[in-house]
Amino acid sequence: MWTSKTISFTLFITTTLLGSCNASAKAKTQPLFPAILIFGDSTVDTGNNNYPSQTIFRAKHVPYGIDLPNHSPNGRFSNGKIFSDIIATKLNIKQFVPPFLQPNLTDQEIVTGVCFASAGAGYDDQTSLTTQAIRVSEQPNMFKSYIARLKSIVGDKKAMKIINNALVVVSAGPNDFILNYYEVPSWRRMYPSISDYQDFVLSRLNNFVKELYSLGCRKILVGGLPPMGCLPIQMTAQFRNVLRFCLEQENRDSVLYNQKLQKLLPQTQASLTGSKILYSDVYDPMMEMLQNPSKYGFKETTRGCCGTGFLETSFMCNAYSSMCQNRSEFLFFDSIHPSEATYNYIGNVLDTKIRGWLKA
């Protein structure tokens, strides 16, 4: 028979357990950063290129976005989510990161962060002049407008606290090589050594990080280069490469650049009081998937899912292009950009690294 003491004790235990469960659930869903701020190129551009009229690098047409919830293209260069969205989701910040140039952004979207990246952009201004993208060096101007809007919503003090604690993602660099240095003879004459050009690009990157710091950014994730020689479009560029193997020299270029970047970032952090700068390795995860595709569910790694997969990207990947049905089995969606499945794996690797970085 239940006594009043038994009932009271049972209620106490139940309430305690429920409270503990709720606290645990809340801890798991709490965002690790108050906001996410993203700068760079098409690997992280969530749609800013929908708005400048002069650029040809757009993804606001099918089949881009075919695996998004509404199956609708919105400027992301993949079949679904890209790295920006995936890392924001994993860190419990938001499901999708909106582009800053999107009209009618809500206050909540501003407070939790936006994307300033532009497809076709590079650290080298010459790269963006060729592609008509929003130059990386211009993206802080959008950021300044964002800061003004954020301050109008939450006030100056809270706005700077959000920016100081936001995760800032910087992802650019490949365009400087595949759309510029490798393709423009005059640029190679100015920088006869690839190492010299890498140093120039890295100096631009370093100045960019310092500018973000001057605007209040403190926690900055900086991406390295992927294995550029394994991008389908680069393999296609070598007409004799009938067997479609990775271009080892371009991969060596990526490795050298990444080694220099990993040496540079700790020096930059040491010069910027209170900063935490993390190198984001995309080369090794990509090579792991390329070398062990079946382990990750991939069956095709040398061409994209869109069209022939050898050359199509941006406007060449369109409604008239043939489309693979098994998109999760393709490492690349078009001839340059990874599929959502690939971004997911890279996101998992970096999520683990970021969480460890926060504890350090």
From Swiss-Prot:
InterPro entries: GDSL, GDSL_lipolytic_enzyme, SGNH_hydro_sf, SGNH_plant_lipase-like. The keyword Secreted applies. Belongs to the 'GDSL' lipolytic enzyme family. One of its GO terms (molecular function) is hydrolase activity, acting on ester bonds. It is found in: Secreted. It comes from Arabidopsis thaliana. GO terms for biological process: lipid catabolic process. Keywords: Glycoprotein, Hydrolase, Lipid degradation, Lipid metabolism, Secreted, Signal. One of its GO terms (cellular component) is extracellular region. The active site is at S42 (nucleophile), D334, H337. Its main location: secreted. This is GDSL esterase/lipase At1g58430. Gene3D superfamilies: SGNH hydrolase. Its EC number is 3.1.1.-. It is an enzyme of class 3 (hydrolase). Glycans are attached at N22, N104, N326. Pfam families: Lipase_GDSL (PF00657). PANTHER family: GDSL ESTERASE/LIPASE EXL3, SGNH HYDROLASE-TYPE ESTERASE DOMAIN-CONTAINING PROTEIN.
